[in-house]
Amino acid sequence: MTDPLYVFDGHNDLPWAMRELCGYELDQADLLAGEPRLQTDLPRLRQGRVGAQFWSVYVPCRLVGDSAVTATLEQIDFVKRLVARYDDRLSLATTAADVDLAVESGRVASLLGMEGGHSIGGSLGTLRMMYELGVRYMTLTHNENVPWADSATDEPILGGLSDFGRGVVREMNRLGMFVDLSHVSPDVMRDALETTVAPVVFSHSCAKALCDSDRNVPDDVLADMARGGGVCMVTFVPMFVHQGVADWYAECLDVTEGRGGDRRRFSDVDPVLAERMQTHPPPACTVDDVADHAEHVREVAGVDHVGLGGDYDGATFFPERMGDVSSYPLLLDTLRGRGWSDTELTRLAHGNVLRAMREVELVSRTRAAG
């Protein structure tokens, strides 16, 4: 029987975490019984009522060109092997109808999302082949600019999208792939919204009005996104949720840079985070802080345009009592306590992103027919 309040989450970094932990060797991590070294495993997905998951096939920005493409293919290969290993628990999905079928069968619909335009190596042909392999969203940038789009966390070069970047958006519309605007600069957000003819997603972002982080979404963009049918999937990462943690994280980035590191790269920043967690810990972040963002997006964009994108296994720490993928019911219960109806919670949990996915598919079919 389908869980009426199952979660369709927009972003989970288990593939890269498995690469780092054990070189993708499924026998070296116990995802079936429970894997305490990770924030994601099969028992906790079930506890968290996760019925559909966009698995991020992220690769670091230090990989460019063919190296980025190869690493992305390895990430895709891992997800497909993961699903094949646990095919009684997981099911590959490339359409909204596939998601429905997986959920009805009691399996987690498993979708692929690329995180950063560097994964296509500047090639529309590569973008098309990634679609053929099952990728259904691409985040236009990660933490660094690509030649055709500015990142939110890099020095702006283009002031938005280049002509090629607009062509990428149009090709994604034609293919039936979500344009994901997490990580991009506000100018890229606005250019993409001006260009797209299909709904966009923010796969893991929060509201800039509540937490002034470069990674978050301004209110005017939230409103424009909603007019086009898009969905902002609220993330749980404390430095994007809580202003005090965002300020603490900015200090960590300054320390990283002061030591000669690159503030855009996790490999340089993470050791500083680990050190300062011990010596100068961040303020507490709670489920109520996350709920505030869900409510703000609902207020600005509307209840039909908010979703969830936890970013588990993609961040070093999470709000109190929200440390892994079993935590979604806590957030849903918190929002219910604030007066959200079951209908509104269902839209937040999965209904909105499924509706947007169907609209993206319809745009693709319409353009193909034309």
Question: What label would you give each PLM region?
Answer:
Residues 1-161, 212-370:
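N-terminal hydrophobic targeting/anchoring segments and the immediately downstream early-domain regions
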Residues 7-14, 184, 202-206:
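Histidine-centered catalytic micro-motifs
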Residues 17-18, 172-192, 304-315:
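Extended hydrophobic secondary-structure segments
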Residues 97, 123-127, 187-198:
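Distinct, well-ordered alpha-helical segments
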Residues 159-172:
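Active-site glycine-rich loop that binds ribose-phosphate moieties when present
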Residues 170-181, 188, 219-227, 296:
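Substrate-binding cleft of carbohydrate-active enzyme catalytic domains
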Residues 186, 194-229:
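Acidic, glycine-rich loop-and-beta core segments that form the ion-binding/anion-interacting portion
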